[in-house]
Amino acid sequence: MKRSCLLSAFILLALSLLLLSGCSSHSPDEGADEPKAVTLGVWKNDTILPTVNAFNAQQEQFQIRLVIYDSLELMQTELMAGKYCDLYLLEMDNSAMAAKSLFVDLMPRVEETLKNTENEVVPELLDAMTVNGALMQIPYSFSIGTCMGLQQYFDGHGISLEDANQALNDHARPIFPEEWKLKARNIASKVSSVSGIFFVDRSKEEVQFQKSEFEEYLKFWMDGWVVQQSQDIDSDLALLIPTFIGAPDEPPAEGYVYTGYPTLENMPAGSYFSFGTAFSIISGSKNVDEAWEFIRFCLSPEQQRSVRGGMPVNSRVLQERIDERLENKEITEADAECFDELLDETEWVRASPDITDIFSEEISACFEGNRQVDEAARMIENRLNLFLAESAEY
């Protein structure tokens, strides 16, 4: 297991030890006239710095101090010395965080200070990120991972594996875009991204892997891949096209509708919210109110209007972008309704990169012809257990 892949798990375990031992967050020595420092920890990234500077320029009572970690060893040393930050902007496993008590539940503050205000977060995103009634982190921006399906076979968002299998068997269509035909790893990465979401539950202390359901799911993709590789199909229109939606002006390709990835019976539609880093507040912090004030600032319309490389999490700013594109005739009313439907019916949240990497390596071996589906499932189950055991040592 690569050390970088253990970052999320390491932070969770190290903070758990620190909070249990009664350590408090670290602040530098402050003079009587100096404003209090509230520390924000980030990993190898200072893109939040302009926002920090803008906040500090209007704040006299306290200042946000950015702590940039560029090595795992440094973070380990700081944490073991009891110098954890008040809040973090990191990429951590949302469901695993919910299983622990290391972070402040942000939902009461969201309900009290954000709901029905200009800083309100996209409700569908909050609902998806709420696990066991708790909200442990809020992203700065987001995108949606989904699939487009041929409209002549699918009528809208949410398709079952049975429906997709029926369409694949009844019609001579390639399952993937033709240009992907020789790109096994490309295919494997898409299947891996949703497999880690659909079949792994880390919201409890013990991971739950739905092994038999995963085997059925992987077999569907493998069967379609084998047929596409071995036959000359007289069509260049793929049955399904995996895609990411990073702006509300991205309607489906002509002849397609947003369907999400196929899912098994009783599962929600197969689209998911994706984001990189997200804000979280350490439960042992003495500056929870101040940390939340900074998060609120980051969610304000003024800050969210500058979001690029994804969609703003501020619901009013997101609606502004939709209205602007409608006014400029960049999208139609039907396109806007299609996006609203996709947003409204997205319930999953992207899996931890640690989990996705495990699936990707084993699934890639299947698509390359080096492993059978049942063998890949066993390997994934073993590696998931090993990953959790290794994580527990930190």
Language-model regions, residue ranges each:
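Conserved N-terminal structural module of periplasmic/extracytoplasmic solute-binding proteins
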Residues: M1-S4, L20-S95, S306, E375, ...
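Extracytoplasmic/periplasmic solute-binding protein
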Residues: M136-Y140, G145, D163-F209, D236
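Extracytoplasmic/periplasmic substrate-recognition and gating elements
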Residues: P252-N314
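Bacterial N-terminal signal peptides
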Residues: A9-L19
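Short helices/loops that flank or line small-molecule/ion binding pockets
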Residues: E73-Y88, S95, F220-P251, E361, ...
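Hinge/lid segment of periplasmic solute-binding proteins
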Residues: E91-T146, V257-N266
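Long, aromatic- and glycine/proline-rich binding clefts that accommodate carbohydrate-like moieties
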Residues: G309-A365, E390-Y394
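Glycine-centered hinge/linker elements that transmit conformational signals in sensory
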Residues: R202-Q231
